[in-house]
Amino acid sequence: MADLVTYSNADHNLEQALITLKKGTQLLKYGRKGKPKFYPFRLSSDEKSLIWISSSGEKRLKLASVSKIVPGQRTAVFQRYLRPEKDYLSFSLLYNGKKKSLDLICKDKVEAEIWIGGLKTLISTGQGGRSKIDGWSGGGLSVDASRELTSSSPSSSSASASRGHSSPGTPFNIDPITSPKSAEPEVPPTDSEKSHVALDNKNMQTKVSGSDGFRVSVSSAQSSSSHGSAADDSDALGDVYIWGEVICDNVVKVGIDKNASYLTTRTDVLVPKPLESNIVLDVHQIACGVRHAAFVTRQGEIFTWGEESGGRLGHGIGKDVFHPRLVESLTATSSVDFVACGEFHTCAVTLAGELYTWGDGTHNVGLLGHGSDISHWIPKRIAGSLEGLHVASVSCGPWHTALITSYGRLFTFGDGTFGVLGHGDKETVQYPREVESLSGLRTIAVSCGVWHTAAVVEIIVTQSNSSSVSSGKLFTWGDGDKNRLGHGDKDPRLKPTCVPALIDYNFHKIACGHSLTVGLTTSGQVFTMGSTVYGQLGNLQTDGKLPCLVEDKLASEFVEEISCGAYHVAALTSRNEVYTWGKGANGRLGHGDLEDRKVPTIVEALKDRHVKYIACGSNYTAAICLHKWVSGAEQSQCSTCRLAFGFTRKRHNCYNCGLVHCHSCSSKKAFRAALAPSAGRLYRVCDSCYVKLSKVSEINDTNRRNSAVPRLSGENRDRLDKSEIRLAKFGTSNMDLIKQLDSKAAKQGKKTDTFSLGRNSQLPSLLQLKDAVQSNIGDMRRATPKLAQAPSGISSRSVSPFSRRSSPPRSATPMPSTSGLYFPVGIADNMKKTNEILNQEIVKLRTQVDSLTQKCEFQEVELQNSVKKTQEALALAEEESAKSRAAKEAIKSLIAQLKDVAEKLPPGESVKLACLQNGLDQNGFHFPEENGFHPSRSESMTSSISSVAPFDFAFANASWSNLQSPKQTPRASERNSNAYPADPRLSSSGSVISERIEPFQFQNNSDNGSSQTGVNNTNQVEAEWIEQYEPGVYITLVALHDGTRDLRRVRFSRRRFGEHQAETWWSENREKVYEKYNVRVSEKSTASQTHRDRDEEEEDIPH
């Protein structure tokens, strides 16, 4: 059941309680036959009857016939299945002259208080203010304002009720709570954090049930909203449904305790789910921002929730809020009528026409309209230019705000970039300023986009029959990019400009997105303009340059409401159906997936709901549905899968929420179900409740592990040992006494509200020591056992969640007394010191754990990065290796092909292919470039050859001759350089390699003058190249124009040949060389002397 939010106004609190009763809940009903069963109970709209749906149909109990309300399990019907542990959650309504009773058990303590207090108020009012609650002194449930309200969780709500003589007119009076200010986000309460309930003669405390303390922002339970008659709409309550990217109460802690920061997570809700609130609300209007939302109830109260940033929630505290929370500072002074949310601020309009703003003002001087960049954490009224004006509505963009007065005057303020304020310039306005170009005209609607604004302005139109009527025309201004202004171009407009393409239509509502504008005519037609991305225009044929009509499924519908998110649109028709289209990320369209929709598509999950209002946030959507009570037909089908019960599909009740489910949807069991007879046994729960209870169990286990006795340091261990020695003398008897009390309480199986941890100054220390020894602090705080017999033997009295007078002896319940317990003062002091030591050790160990965890996370990230880099390097190496292998194979193949071609040439055929395309000759040598410079690979090859062949030897054709003189070398070099261009295929490759290499060589100096002349004649030389005959032997050949070849020189490697070895080799292999290369041989081929020319060697060999 929902928790109470406290107010200072008694009428508000009474109305809040009645709203809760009208919405109803699942209660466990006892009968005269059979076992107890779950039924939905609610209060009728006229507040005169109590209605529930049983297996035989709807039943009613008129409150006028109820003569008495009896808390506890005292009737004979309860005795059939007595559950003492649920005594404080039970009550009975006696009617028909106390002859019959309606016996019920509530889910938790707060729910019981609301039902008992609300029914008591109605019965007392109906019977002249005479109280009918047994044991109550005629007063209602009220609050002692002088007492301090306590809570064990930041998000919990507590109330203190006093048993006094309050007037019947104000029976349900609860004071507001001031939550502690903290920079940490609001952490959901857990089962281990439930405060112990202390009862005395004057006060009691209420706390949210542990089973409901851990909640997600949206509920998985199906709502009972459905279509109803128009006559009931005024009395129906408003439920909020929400879908898209929604804030979740799973908080992630980053860093160690000293520098810890908290990250609030968000979850994607793909279909509409009812918003789960800590209170039961009647929502009238809702507004959605980027990371927060707000709504206004029918009672004029404003609630906000979401991620806190600069005070935009208005609670005055710097922490996130997961469930709607009352903005107390504004509700206490004014009744709110309208609310709007921007990205960093929030605006609210009261019934008195006052405008309040709050939020982060540091982003822009004029964002809040107060003339400064100061952030306001609570609502602040805007005066100045609005003094004396009645504000009717307001619209918020990320950086500017627009408002309309009751007389239709339009004011804007904030950042004026792109002329978004409509004042004819781009200046920032710090206070609300009227748009002068629309002065004298009545503005009926306005909407703020990111950098553009749109408004509907009434224009007097003269008809053909000379009559004048007012018609709403669409005006836009600001940034014209993406055609969002609808003027057919992308130019900005600094002042409001009427959209000419829509001049013939009568508009009355407008909405703006990021790059989108949507208008609604009085005839129910929807026009869109702007970017076509994600299909947000809802028309497949448009290019977005001009406004287009949204038809398709809306062609036969009458649209009543429209709303825009950043990139999606929602429309509400007259048949209360919701259509959405545009971007589908995060499930913001509500169709159960993440797909975009380019045409309007109905939201099936809301098809059987009566929707009365819609609102879009940046990436989520919300709707207000009229709440209708569960019908008999809905009781005959599963609350989750909506399938009807039958012979094979049996119905089961969830022991946590009480709703009916089939076996498939409630096949799991869990401990600590709210409506379970025993918390220590497994009971059937639905799937959604199982998830919630599992989370609570996990948190409890974590808390138990954290509360275990830590390993002590040396200094603290010595201190603890000394304390144990002092306690050993007399501590045994006291611990035995506590164990005996626990064993008796376990047999009795009851909980007490009077055995409080805060009642006696000595008992808390004993209990704390016991918790430290048993490593079970959380369990001890959650359930302090009730004793069956008081040690002092005093007379027992009844115990109930409400403080009241003694009941008759027959219904008395034993209560413990602490008067018989006595412990020396030294024990309490020693246990306090021990507890402090343990707490210090826990803090140290937690700090170490957080530090090590953080280091481990960093190292894991670094390891992942290293592995990723290694994989990338291996992939790159493998790729390069594959390329290298392929290149080598290609080279080998080309060389083999070239050799085959050379072998096939007939004798005497000139060789035309002196080099390959890649610059390699047949033997793999690289030719230099045309400019005389060699490539790097050629240079390396040339250098290698030069290093192994440093000697030059000259020879005559078929004979040895004198070496060339040094002065002949330049001529030979010149001759060689001039011979190469004769072949066009060699001209691109430059001179041959022999120009740079003049190693151990023989020159062909034939005595045949004609032969020598033929070689030296540059006109007869066609090509020259070098070939390797065998390792260490390099042959220089010349191709002549007549098709013959001549041998120019032979070079030998110094590493393989000496001077005489080279001469010997040549004399032995000369004929073979001539025969192999088909070189003409001179008739005079006698060898001549050979000598070594050192000067030529030094000149030709490169250094």
From Swiss-Prot:
The keyword Transcription does not apply. Residues 962-979 have a biased composition (Polar residues). PROSITE patterns: BRX, RCC1_2, RCC1_3, ZF_FYVE. The keyword Metal-binding applies. One of its GO terms (molecular function) is phosphatidylinositol binding. Keywords: Coiled coil, Guanine-nucleotide releasing factor, Lipid-binding, Metal-binding, Repeat, Zinc, Zinc-finger. Residues 828-904 form a coiled coil. Residues 22-123 form the PH domain. Residues 151-169, 217-231, 791-818 have a biased composition (Low complexity). A zinc finger (FYVE-type) spans 632-694. InterPro entries: Brevis_radix_dom, BRX_N, PH-like_dom_sf, PH_domain, RCC1/BLIP-II, Reg_chr_condens, Ub_ligase/GEF_domain, Znf_FYVE. Residues 144-233, 783-818, 962-988, 1079-1103 are annotated as: Disordered. Pfam families: BRX, BRX_N, FYVE, PH_12, WD40_RLD. Zn(2+) 1 binds at residues 638, 641, 662, 665. Mostly expressed in flowers, and, to a lower extent, in stems, leaves, siliques, seeds. Zn(2+) 2 binds at residues 654, 657, 686, 689. RCC1 repeats lie at residues 237-298, 299-351, 353-406, 407-458, 471-522, 524-574, 575-626. Residues 1023-1078 form the BRX domain. Binds to phosphatidic acid and to phosphoinositides such as PtdIns3P, PtdIns(3,4)P(2), PtdIns(3,4,5)P(3) and PtdIns(4,5)P(2). Catalyzes guanine nucleotide exchange on specific Rab proteins. This is PH, RCC1 and FYVE domains-containing protein 1. It comes from Arabidopsis thaliana. The lineage of its organism: Eukaryota, Viridiplantae, Streptophyta, Embryophyta, Tracheophyta.
